[in-house]
Amino acid sequence: MNQDQALKAVVEPATMETDRFGHPLDPIVRYARGSILKSSDEEIVRMLRARQIVGERVRKSGKDSVYDLSGMNRGSGITVQDVPHLTSHVPFFAHFEGKTEPLALKHMGADPARHAALILNRVSAANFIALTTLLKLGARVFAFAPTGGQTHPSAVRPISMVSADFREFHSYTELAKAWEAQGAPRLLLITPISASKRHLPFAEFKQALALPRSHETLVYVDDAHMASRIAFFDEPPTYQVGDIDLAVCSADKHVAGPRAGVLVGRTDLVTAIGSRAYELGLEAQAGQYVGVGNALRNFDPGAVKHAGELAKRLIQVLAEKYGPKRAYLGGPGVSIAGDDVLEMALERGGARGKPGLVAVEAAGLVAMQMLEQDGILTIGAVAMPGSAPAVRLMMYPDGPRLGIEPIVASLERSIDRLSRLVHDVPAARAQLLGG
């Protein structure tokens, strides 16, 4: 048994789950692997190819020729004024050391008297180091994720690595029933907004935090999309929701900062986790640390709200075109699940039988087509391995600049293209991976 098989064995259900078309679901990422995107290796090739397409387009036609509908910024976040103090670690220590953590506490609504912050190089790094520090063999983890969404693979993987017992719930009723029957777990892991942009009802979020705990129970919130919760759903920052021990948010998801994880929690927990993070080199480096500070200081919910208003108009158009059960409002954007996109392509092309593609490949093909032909950059093109298999059209940051009509037209052309590729695996492979 190799390492990947060993990790999957820990979370493998007794009965193998399948997608709508009968393909078995990978128990870590919770979507089907196909003949093209067979593993993380191929997903990385697709991601790097998309980056190359963006680069070539910008070099040829300028950066405004790409319309960023990813919901992310991922720039450096540093200013011209910052640069002279980043020439070595000496001026960095004098001007920036210790300045970002207080901003992180404020951003997440934490209490400086009880909480501390740690700036890490990714949310995935935060999930990895926090969960492998807090959990051990056999520890029970109850995960609470939105209906239609899942706990992120970056959290499932470390839970599997330590051989903890992972169970996922999608309603408060299910969670409370298991809690009463089995007792409080070691860890309650809550995902308020999933990678597929499904949203956990706020009332259920609060109810979960109110469940009775043992002296060993910890609550960890993967609040990567906290900015959307605040700006679009009008919910409070993480630590204003209820009693939480540890939480992470992103510095780049609907925040104008670099890709980084902002980990905030009880001081004793952050101290222990921080020691291991420094051992493994997961801490944010100088420029990233400064960029995170600037992004948190300058976070503008208004820009996200504005994008959200455009998303509300877009969902009306797409729900009418594709059906209200297929297109759904995912915060300040619109999403369509990969299985639905694949089904739409089959219907449009009149194809019969089991498709030659799986959901993650179908969603990826739509994303790559929109990027190559129209310069529209979505998460599905540049996402890391494990990202949800869905077409996600986030209106931040460039939705207002592009407008609804070009977005709808590009999506239509891309689904048409997909309808011609559902049984043409070689052509689909060429578009996803190149060569």
Regions found by a protein language model. Give the residues of each.
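Conserved C-terminal alpha-helix-loop-beta "cap" of PLP-dependent enzymes
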Residues: 2-42, 327-429
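Conserved PLP-enzyme active-site core in the AAT-like
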Residues: 2-13, 17-19, 24, 99, ...
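Conserved N-terminal alpha-helix of the aminotransferase class I/II PLP-enzyme fold
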Residues: 29, 37-129, 153-157
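Short, surface-exposed, charged loop/turn segments at secondary-structure junctions
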Residues: 90, 262-265, 349-351
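Soluble or luminal CAZymes and related metallo-dependent hydrolases
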Residues: 96, 306, 362
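Short, low-order "capping/linker" segments at domain edges
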Residues: 305, 433-435
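C-terminal structural cap/anchor segments
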Residues: 309, 313-329, 339-341
